[in-house]
Amino acid sequence: KREHEKEVLQKAIEENNNFSKMAEEKLTTKMEAIKENREAQMAAKLERLREKDKKLEEIRKGKECKEPSED
């Protein structure tokens, strides 16, 4: 009887450890995916900002070229 209790306890501990490992792996994978997604979103936002800056700079240059001829 005592041996059976040890086996049951050992199996429960093993299952708990396996569950913990699986949960940790899933969490790690999810966190990595979230991080990659966040970095991709930030890169896309930075790219849009650069494009806006580029357009604004082109508009400024265009106005600078037009201003002297208008005077």
From Swiss-Prot:
Quote the gene name from the UniProt entry.
stmn1-b
Q: Could you tell me which species this protein originates from?
A: Xenopus laevis (African clawed frog)
Q: What GO terms are given for molecular function?
A: tubulin binding
Q: Which positions are tagged coiled coil? A: 1-67
Question: One GO BP annotation here?
Answer: microtubule depolymerization
Protein's name according to its UniProt entry: Stathmin-1-B
A Pfam family of this chain: Stathmin
Q: What does the record say about PTM?
A: From unphosphorylated forms to highly phosphorylated ones in the mature egg, followed by progressive dephosphorylation from the mid-blastula to the tailbud stage.
- Looking at the record, the residues that make up the SLD domain are 1-71
Record keyword Coiled coil present:
yes
